């Protein structure tokens, strides 16, 4: 994604990332370009130049372009060059300091809530812009029941829209957020207010049981096309603060496969092949690359997954520098045993 320092909003930065990735060789990196310069939402980035440098998509990652006319122009360029538009859907004007789902849990903690409409309003707008421009729209990390409904109806109308769901959004609800009871710091002689575990703070936030059920059914019915990680690592220091102050985001990469298998395959919503399709073939198809399936002559980017092992997630074993997960200590089934990139083993589980 382009939300780096510097922001990926021109071909020079795209080329730098691609060259760096080739040097490291641990994964095939496809760099997405920013929609606007500096992700400031005021002026379009050099989309044409970045397309020539090889970007498969544009995104304002982590925010929405609130200027609808500017976003329309970006979509027109995306349609012209046949690249995808990856949309984070959030009406920032409605967030109003919210840090978790707007429900009884937020009220009990005295925290600002984020309503479903924050997401749903922008989803509706972006679908309409996709309809008007012909751009290929992909909705990132959908979390609401109405997102599933809108995607379903858009597809029925022939609009070029696809959508993804993240494991935390189909596994947890706002009721699962670990609450921290109010205490008194006897050394500092101050009262510590009730709060919540910041490892449950992500954007979009965890929603309700009704939303979770709709997302699962949307994946089952192929309304929702992709299972994505929304991997957002943060340091312990970043997260070791209040729910109001902590950054949004959790690590998602190392728990995505096991949570998907446990919740959706063993839960009866997906077959193993559907899981593989939504985590590999469909994403590749959406961004227009010839990957995601195993055939003679294809590039061997392969994950070897063991569906039989049951274990407890231990954040201290993560390869990511981030340990900010709400799933530490959770019992799951299914484990990644090996990863190959271009036919070369880049990861191997040494335990077996």
Regions found by a protein language model. Give the residues of each.
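C-terminal cap of metal-dependent C-N hydrolases
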Residues: 242-245, 266, 299-352
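A glycine-rich helix N-cap at a beta->alpha junction
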Residues: 20-34
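Short acidic, glycine/proline-enriched helix-loop-strand junctions
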Residues: 27, 78-83, 160-162, 240-254
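His/Asp/Glu-enriched, well-ordered alpha-helical/loop segment
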Residues: 108-136, 196-200, 217-227, 232-307
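Active-site beta->alpha loop and helix N-cap motifs at the rims of alpha/beta catalytic domains
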Residues: 34-40
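Charged helix-capping and loop-helix junction motifs
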Residues: 12-17, 44-45, 71-73, 245
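Metal-associated gating/positioning segment near the N- to mid-region
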Residues: 1-24
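Histidine/acidic residue-rich metal-binding segments in metalloenzymes
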Residues: 42-227
